[in-house]
């Protein structure tokens, strides 16, 4: 739900108030003690640029924000196992996968400043279990993953759609869904607050088989995390105007 729609439905006078409330909720969508993915299943890792083309600037990416994504690839029949956020006796509401034998498992998304090795390696270390099988597109930023204790499988893709569909299908499905969600629901977002929207997308994605437990999960997490303040958001907005940093997108 966009802040504008939220404002209208609740009858909130100021848009800024609705915006702040939603971001406080998004702050409660990331468990501070969440575990790393890839304990049982391979993990696809790739990056994408989020944001639209700036008018008159062709395909230039300096007005886009770089996001790294990591997603488990798991057998479809395993997708409906127990969820740590479910109360005892609850069952998932629906299945997914559209007939595929493998589907996307747990997801992580993170805004990053660049594609350098010193940026990407810490992202993998923080989110993916050691000894996990990690699949990438051959980008040099991941060259040392084997030395860090991962089973690294790199396949140079270089824009080949057939190779992408075969080697990294799930993360690119995720990226497509993310773009559609940001544009369709929020009509584009500011780079200053993009991570909050990514957190919401990941929260919804990881609970898509249990949509009715989202509220319960947010309440559990909310008592563990610090809520952002108005000052936090104004500081983020000021930083986004720095010409050396991403500017609003969408």
Where are these regions (language model features)?
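Residue-level recognition of single "structural anchor" positions
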Residues: 1-250
